[in-house]
């Protein structure tokens, strides 16, 4: 079950429309066919692995034949298929904000900056 905010679908679709990008949201990737010239965005870590493996099964190379953008960076994205590009918040900043809340009981509602870590998957 996807724990990612469902409102992201609306914002993603709107962004694509405004930029003139064709987009499709496919929540079930069990039967995904990876296509040449398409960029995939994976929210869950296991979906990153599934897309890369499926691309290989179809004789396609990530970063050359298809693109992949992962949500929330992890260290292994640096080494999977020469690097998976990720979109992520600054986790250290989030940890500091959470610690400040716990230690000082200071409520926060704050947007954290998003970083793109560009690697060879795009």
Name the predicted role of every residue range.
Residues 1-122:
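Bacterial carbohydrate/catabolite-sensing allosteric modules
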């Amino acid at each position: 079950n996807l724990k990612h905010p469902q409102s992201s679908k609306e914002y993603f679709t709107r962004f694509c429309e405004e930029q003139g990008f064709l987009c499709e949201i496919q929540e079930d990737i069990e039967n995904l066919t990876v296509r040449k010239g398409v960029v995939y965005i994976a929210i869950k870590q296991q979906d990153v692995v599934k897309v890369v493996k499926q691309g290989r099964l179809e004789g396609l190379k990530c970063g050359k034949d298809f693109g992949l953008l992962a949500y929330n960076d992890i260290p292994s994205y640096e080494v999977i298929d020469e690097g998976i590009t990720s979109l992520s918040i600054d986790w250290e900043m989030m940890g500091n904000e959470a610690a400040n809340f716990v230690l000082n009981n200071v409520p926060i509602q704050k947007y954290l900056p998003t970083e793109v870590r560009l690697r060879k998957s795009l």
